[in-house]
């Protein structure tokens, strides 16, 4: 109550922020006549002037009014488009590390040019982030003329681009790309083996389009760079065969309950669990398939991986549906994004789930992958010094943006008042009744010439509606992941009079639906159109546009509520753009997933009490409230999951930052010999301490064990026992010094053979490879730890604290292993004298000649022989071949230098 009174007096925080920013809008407007007087050359020279002022210490914020005025005037000259005052407000919000909520059709793409230009003046690079490659390319090409007019370079970062092209894109003042590609480039840069391989600069300013889609919907999706693990495709196929024998466990209070089934399903948590009866049957079937021995338990330690395969196969069959969660195209299982309905080419589910789905669909099973590097979007985008974003629907997630990303959400007012009519939801008992009602509504409205957009939550549902429309004889277009290539054309014409378009999740589509259709699309189909043709097309469009407005504008039909209110609002937001007329309504049934899982019992009882008849809909505030509560429940649960994910990932993030910092320092120096010497001292001290405890009696020393360890791990022959027998006066400290000095002498002799430069490069290479290998193993160990850490709760321990404690111990152990393995590898490497290499090469040539004379071998036998032992190589050592000394370097960079 008190807060409401205070808000009325002082205004909300949103109002106060906009009031402050409007003062700057007035300043920019006053500068407009001055900018109009400037010639093109004088306007373009402003960029250099601003940069000079920044170098002299002027703050970026002080330049804002002038810079925005320059962009506004340049846009008028280049595009013939003037930034509205609300777009200037949006630009200021984006410059202040905030989220700007701007409704669909308010010109977010043009708004982004303002903060992008201002922050590009620093020369530190601006990253504009979009949800897909099409939008990245479109926005970059659309805005390129403006930025180039102002003297700024524009780069596009697309998947599959070679490193030099990516480096050039990142070197540009403003770079457009997708969230995935920016994240993957960051990971790849931190796997590089030379500074030249890196493509990104230091992360400065990210401007994220559809920020809710990227920072919230995809927050649970980690970016993973992986390498192939062992092939277990046969096991997936065998396990897949047993799943159809299992029966689902029904609820005990349901009509179909007939005793215990083999597995139960928790739809809320998306989990499947075997029952006792199911476990017995699975074990019997696995024994029958010859996968498991008679009498073995699926839960025994030796069968943990087998249990993992069974769970993955069960989830693939029960929780993942074709044309909902994925599609099968050209013999490949492609994931469908649950939020946008787009296919995610190249993405794969982890933990063997993707292979299980491939086995279920009987397509080629690709090998499982092992994680080499990974990061979540939450942690990647928090690496930027400055982060901002824009979307049409952010206010419902304002708390999450604030608590996780420290970003405030500011709702920017529309340029014209919103007049769309949002009609109350209609709820039916069955799915079929709901579909019938939707078809009737479409018939009535399309006859009047009103365009209709039908939003569905999956490809499967879009095809159900499509079939019903075909049956009713209503012409329509379908926009889903299966017709991805036709997207731009379908959306461009969705606003035509009487057009019916079915779309799977309009979130992140990035294209406005213009009433009367898109006249620009018509012009684009003409070859070299003249001004007269363009004028005719515009005039015809104006007539169509007015007719559609008279019919009521674009009507939105939602076929069911999404888990998130924000996705529903995005669908609604496609109508009523820029003050146009429009309407929206959601049709629901008690068989919808959201209603069935979260709101079914209460609403079903309510509908029964109201005496519902078949085909009759309920339209009541109670029902709307129950649905809103169900959505809030899901949103709250999803937020908790994302928050928990972040808390766990923050532990890995700190370790990742430490490893990547150390790795980059390694890359940037050419000589790490001092580091190697320091590590060697630590390793030998620790090793000797294990066998000769400090300040201990000689009787406690294990000299034989130490000799064996030095031989096995460091290739050092040291007769320690003989030294002690021969020199009774040899005490502990002197012995330690002798062991270390002899190890150092052996290493220096190797260095003399290959040369200082080769050894420095080799040390660096060994350090990087060992670090990468151990980091990869550490990531896998962290995954395993995380999967089972929740069980610590049963022992009255906090799983998060346990995870932090254990992961820190694992990290410390990994760093110790790094030191040990680096010194062990460097000690074991065999180097050869130049004359030995010549003798070896002569021997290889003779062997090759002998093999060439044996003509009786078939080609196949010859091939198998040549790919066998290296001693049977049939050609001289090439300059790019591995050096025979075992250093791992190319011959030309190692002993090949000595042959010159």
Swiss-Prot record:
Report any Pfam family annotated for this entry: SecA_DEAD
Coiled-coil features, chain-numbered ranges: none
Q: Where is this region: Disordered?
A: 849-900
Which Gene Ontology cellular component terms are annotated? cell envelope Sec protein transport complex; cytosol; plasma membrane
Q: What induces it?
A: Repressed under conditions of excess protein secretion capacity and derepressed when protein secretion becomes limiting. This is regulated by SecM.
For this chain's record, the cofactor binding note is: May bind 1 zinc ion per subunit.
Give GO MF terms, alphabetically.
ATP binding; metal ion binding; protein-exporting ATPase activity
Root EC class: translocase
Q: Where does ATP bind?
A: 87, 105-109, 512
Q: Which UniProt keywords apply?
A: ATP-binding, Cell inner membrane, Cell membrane, Cytoplasm, Membrane, Metal-binding, Nucleotide-binding, Protein transport, Translocase, Translocation, Transport, Zinc
Which cofactor is essential here? Zn(2+)
Which cellular compartments is it found in?
Cell inner membrane; Cytoplasm
Q: What EC number(s) would the UniProt record show?
A: 7.4.2.8
Which top-level group of life is the source organism from? Bacteria
Please tell me whether the keyword Cell inner membrane is annotated for this protein.
yes
Entry function: Part of the Sec protein translocase complex. Interacts with the SecYEG preprotein conducting channel. Has a central role in coupling the hydrolysis of ATP to the transfer of proteins into and across the cell membrane, serving both as a receptor for the preprotein-SecB complex and as an ATP-driven molecular motor driving the stepwise translocation of polypeptide chains across the membrane.
The family note in this entry says:
Belongs to the SecA family.
Give the protein name, as stated in the record.
Answer: Protein translocase subunit SecA
What organism does the record attribute this protein to?
A: Pectobacterium atrosepticum (strain SCRI 1043 / ATCC BAA-672)
Gene name in the database record: secA
